[in-house]
């Protein structure tokens, strides 16, 4: 999987003048825990901003990385999509929530769950571009076609400026024939849109949240941290052209 908390950390470390905001819109809260945030102690989260119209500024928490802030997830996000059904312009709520922050940060990274529910649709409607993670596993390519179809619909009806930032291969193990086959197939289909960076399987990244510190500060020399550093650099390079 891709860890946006790490990508954001690496962006700020690589370029000290960059300001990055991570929005954790996944109920599993991996981005929040990856940046040392205990969501049980959070008083204002992305949930309050979406459902209760809380000011986004009240939900922003500073992290231990200079220039990197986060709006954390909350367990109540699990039921948020049902609560959103009765709201006006429900697909555009997150876009409205994030609007005041667009000029405050160089990058806003929105972490979503893999499911194509209303929260993910909100994120795609609010975004300028989308990174598509491709797990090097059996049904990966099937999932891509569904997501691409959703992006096409959102682009035509909700967000005409939405672009594909790139396809990112994750959970890669070069020893597995299947992983290499998926890599070849994705590269053949999407060519220049595929990131040069590949995120390899890595255990160290999973250990950091249990220590309550950002993953990049837990083990900067791990393979996973180095992969995410390369990805951050690639994103910065692509966006500076």
Enumerate the language-model features and the residues they cover.
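P-loop NTP-binding core
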Residues: 3, 9-241
């Amino acid at each position: 999987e891709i860890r946006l908390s790490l990508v954001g950390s690496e962006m700020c470390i690589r370029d000290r003048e960059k300001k990055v905001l991570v929005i954790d819109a996944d109920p599993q809260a991996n981005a929040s825990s990856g940046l040392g945030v205990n969501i049980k102690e959070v008083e204002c989260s992305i949930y309050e901003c979406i459902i209760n119209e809380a000011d986004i500024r009240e939900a922003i928490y500073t992290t231990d990385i200079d220039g990197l802030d986060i709006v954390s997830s909350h367990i109540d996000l699990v039921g948020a999509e049902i609560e959103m059904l009765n709201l006006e312009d429900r697909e555009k709520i997150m876009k409205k929530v994030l609007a005041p922050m667009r000029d405050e940060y160089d990058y806003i990274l929105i972490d979503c769950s893999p499911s194509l529910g209303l929260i993910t649709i909100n994120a795609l409607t609010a975004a300028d571009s989308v990174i598509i993670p491709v797990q090097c596993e059996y049904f990966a390519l099937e999932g891509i076609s569904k997501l691409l179809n959703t992006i096409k619909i959102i682009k035509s009806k909700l967000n005409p400026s939405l672009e594909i930032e790139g396809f990112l291969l994750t959970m890669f193990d070069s020893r597995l024939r299947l992983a290499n086959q998926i890599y070849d197939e994705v590269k053949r289909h999407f060519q220049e849109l595929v990131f040069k960076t590949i995120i390899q399987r890595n255990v160290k990244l999973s250990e950091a949240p249990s220590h309550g510190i950002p993953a990049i500060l837990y083990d900067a020399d791990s393979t996973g941290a180095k992969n995410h550093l390369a990805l951050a650099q690639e994103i910065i390079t692509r966006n500076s052209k």
